Amino acid sequence: RTWLRIDFDGIRCVWCPLDCFFGAGTGAPASSNWYVSSDGKGTFTSRWVMPYAEHADLRLEKRTDIPFTAVITGYVDDFDWTAQTLYFHATYHDETSIPVNNDYNSPDNLDWNFTTITGRGVYCGDVLSLYNHCPDWYGEGDEKIWIDNDTFPSFMGTGTEDYYNCSWAPVVPFATPFGGAPRADEASSHGYNTFVRTRNLDVIPFGQRLQFDLEMLSWNPGAVDYRAAAFWYGTAASAATEKN
């Protein structure tokens, strides 16, 4: 319930709950990744490079009555800002009671929008933290990423487990330098799950627009609650969908 806001040169670029920003998700369990990590005890680390031309403003917003003490350490170095330099962004989107369907051929199946970014930029990773109300696997639908003026997705995957480098639904938490599942409450996939992926070697550049959707297909019909954080670089004019 604590949010991180960072403004670079007067532009709000980071607006995200702490647990998702640092790749841990709901409950903030231990998580280790090339760019973000959590020790599960309240210490978080981010290693994203966040350039700015003149000034940065970092704030924590507490959305709870529970008091806490925060110590923030930042590392700053010289940077040669040019006309091509992009700002780091972390944007957040959540929704509850999203329907999932096990009729894979139904024309009514939902494509849930993870994020849509307008303007020029580079997509670098994301976190999906969720509660699954279904008794078992909920992420059978394809992930779809459209770039600029695509009429068909440039990236068309085969399910949430493959997008997040699991190859099947995670039955225990695991971590790799590029992704993982910090939280997997039950082997059945019921309950809380969290996934993280950072695109260390496979960032996605775009010139005008990027749209990332997840097809909502499952083994059994039901509903899920999704919290989605996206990490990307963009110009001062670039913007992403936010719903929270």
Stretches with model-predicted labels:
Residues 1-244:
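Beta-strand-centric surfaces of beta-sandwich/beta-rich domains
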